[in-house]
Structure formats: structure tokens, C-alpha cells
Amino acid sequence: MNIKIASRNSALALWQTHHIRDLLIAQGHSVEIITMKTKGDVILDTPLAKIGGKGLFTKELENSMLEGSADIAVHSLKDVPTTFPDGLKLACVCSREDVRDAMLSMKYKNLDELPQGAKVGTTSLRRKMQILAHRADLDIISLRGNVNSRIAKLKNGEFDAIILAMAGINRLNLSKEVKFTSAIDTIPAMGQGALGIEAIDKKEILDAIEFLNDEKSVVETTIERDFVHTLNGGCQAPIGINAKLKGDKIEVEAILGLVDGSEILRDSKTYPKLAYKIAGKNFADEFIARGAKELLKRAEEMV
């Protein structure tokens, strides 16, 4: 079968798409790749949360599927909204990479070594919230652009450190580009480290790609995405959520709050694996009972 894949044209997006292409070819399919820029790739002078709207890195890819020029799209799952246009669905969640965030620096080994007032680059309100809760003295600055341009800004001294997803660092072998790479103790974004395959809702396409699903990753990310969906939080909201499947139990921890780290709700819980389809909503409802929606509304007003 010939399968057409829509992809962003960044280095990381193409790595991800080529990875899926190779798996499809190994199953006997032929593959075409259609690359494009998304709104999130084009508008680089504005923090993502200020651009507003959901699907900043997915909408153009979705349009190409709805128009019939592509069958599937490969995404970083953390960028994928929790709702889909009619005719499209999240068809697969692939085996997950490292879910952690990481700090890269040319001078400092880890977050605690950073001097007072150090300039730290990240786009993510979730990362900003958690870092400032730990180190309120740091200067967190919005850092947009592709991975290579971010590392270039670190190397030329614009930043003392930058924060990226460890999965992307591993996939592109970026540790060799900088002196220090260290995982940081933040709760990741929903779906972080996993690739999500969005597809047109056609049986022959869905059947052809079903083998890409990884059960453990599906269980974990279903909880994470249901949690964020119940809170009505977009991909840019300051929400961290991580589910870990261990045997027949799932350990879940989550955090949300104000972007400056001054007010935070955090909790953890263990659910039976069999409850994974309701656990995310139930966990979110507990946060809502503690005022999570009001807190997120205030966080949105701070941006």
C-alpha cells in the first residue's frame, strides 16, 4: 500500500517521520513524505502562548489530510491537541522515548549550579512554572525556533542554559553539541517522549498502521491526555502530567499553577491498569475540586 505522510520540515520532525517511514517500508508499504511549515514554525517572534489557539504545530498537517494529499501525519504527541477535526483521529501512539526535560549548558552542570539571575531559555510555560518554583531568582526567557537555532543561541552566549525535551536530544544526538546535558526534576507535558500518528479515519489506513501502537505508551498517554482534556488545557497550558505503567499499576503525578511558580497544585496517585480509560478524568476532577480551573484561568491572564 502507498502511504502519504504529512510532516513539518524541522530536523526533529523529519527524524520522526523518517523513523515511521522506515517501519512502514519494513512492513512492505511504499511511502511518500509531504513536508510543510506550520503556524508554530513561521511565527518565531512571539511566545507560543501569546499566539493563542490549539494545534499550532498540527493544523496545516491536518488540512493536508482532510484535503486528501496525505493519509497520516507524524507528530510529537505533546504538540497534539486532545480534540480532532471530523474525519481524523489519533490512530497510534508509538513506543515512548525518555519523558524527561533536560538542561543544556556550555558552563553549568545542572540547574542548581546556575548563578543567581542566570538566563534560561524555554518556550514552555509548564517548564517555566516548575523551574521558578524551584529557583525564583532565575531569568526565564522565551526561546523559539528550531533545535539548531536554539543551541546556536546558547553557544553564542545569549543564554546560560536552555531547556529541551530529552527525547529530542537523544533522537538528534544533541548532547555532543554542548558541554553539559542534565535531566531536570520537572513533571513533563502530556505525551512527552512519544510519537503520535494522526490519520484519516479510513479502515485500510488504520489497519496498515495499527502495528505502530505500543500498549504501554497508549495506556500512559491516554491518562495524560484525558487529564489535560478534562481541565480544558491546551498544549501550551502550564500543566505537567506523567503516568508510569508498572506491572498492573499506574503511578500518576501532575502539577499545574501560575507561570511564575508562586502558586501550584501538585498531587500523585496510583490506579489499577484496568482503570486507565477513566483514571485521567478522575484525577483531573480531584484537581478541579481544589480550584484548578480558576488557577489555570489566572495563569492564562498572566501571559
Curated annotation (Swiss-Prot):
Cross-referenced SUPFAM superfamilies: Periplasmic binding protein-like II, Porphobilinogen deaminase (hydroxymethylbilane synthase), C-terminal domain
Pfam families recorded: Porphobil_deam (PF01379), Porphobil_deamC (PF03900)
Gene Ontology terms, MF aspect: hydroxymethylbilane synthase activity
GO biological process: protoporphyrinogen IX biosynthetic process
InterPro entries: HemC, Porphobilin_deaminase_cofac_BS, Porphobilin_deaminase_N, Porphobilinogen_deaminase_C, Porphobilinogen_deaminase_C_sf
Pathway as given in its UniProt record: Porphyrin-containing compound metabolism; protoporphyrin-IX biosynthesis; coproporphyrinogen-III from 5-aminolevulinate: step 2/4
Cofactor(s) annotated in UniProt: dipyrromethane
E.C. number(s) listed in UniProt: 2.5.1.61
Enzyme class: transferase
Catalytic activity: 4 porphobilinogen + H2O = hydroxymethylbilane + 4 NH4(+)
Record PTM S-(dipyrrolylmethanemethyl)cysteine, positions in chain: C235
PROSITE patterns documented for this protein: PORPHOBILINOGEN_DEAM
Co-factor note (free text): Binds 1 dipyrromethane group covalently.
Record carries keyword Cell cycle: no
Keywords from the UniProt entry: Porphyrin biosynthesis, Transferase
Subunit comment: Monomer.
Family: Belongs to the HMBS family.
HAMAP family (UniProt xref): Porphobil_deam
Cited function: Tetrapolymerization of the monopyrrole PBG into the hydroxymethylbilane pre-uroporphyrinogen in several discrete steps.
Official protein name in the record: Porphobilinogen deaminase
Organism: Campylobacter fetus subsp. fetus (strain 82-40)
